[in-house]
Amino acid sequence: MFTVISYFGFLLVALAFTLVTYLGLRAIQLI
């Protein structure tokens, strides 16, 4: 059970990091 929670936690962090990077690149292009 702990492994599943850890896996989903890692997936969520990876998704958030990708989203932040994507938004950051978009912001740089708009400037």
UniProtKB/Swiss-Prot annotation:
Membrane topology recorded in Swiss-Prot or TrEMBL: Single-pass membrane protein
InterPro entries reported in the protein's UniProt record: Cyt_b6/f_cplx_su6
GO BP annotations listed: photosynthesis
Keyword Nucleus: no
Gene Ontology CC terms, in alphabetical order: chloroplast thylakoid membrane; cytochrome b6f complex
GO terms assigned for molecular function: electron transporter, transferring electrons within cytochrome b6/f complex of photosystem II activity
Domain of life (superkingdom): Eukaryota
Protein keywords: Chloroplast, Electron transport, Membrane, Photosynthesis, Plastid, Thylakoid, Transmembrane, Transmembrane helix, Transport
Pfam families assigned to the protein according to its UniProt record, in alphabetical order: PetL
Residues spanning the membrane: 4-24
Subcellular location: Plastid, Chloroplast thylakoid membrane
Family note: Belongs to the PetL family.
Known role: Component of the cytochrome b6-f complex, which mediates electron transfer between photosystem II (PSII) and photosystem I (PSI), cyclic electron flow around PSI, and state transitions. PetL is important for photoautotrophic growth as well as for electron transfer efficiency and stability of the cytochrome b6-f complex.
Subunit comment: The 4 large subunits of the cytochrome b6-f complex are cytochrome b6, subunit IV (17 kDa polypeptide, PetD), cytochrome f and the Rieske protein, while the 4 small subunits are PetG, PetL, PetM and PetN. The complex functions as a dimer.
Name of this chain's protein: Cytochrome b6-f complex subunit 6
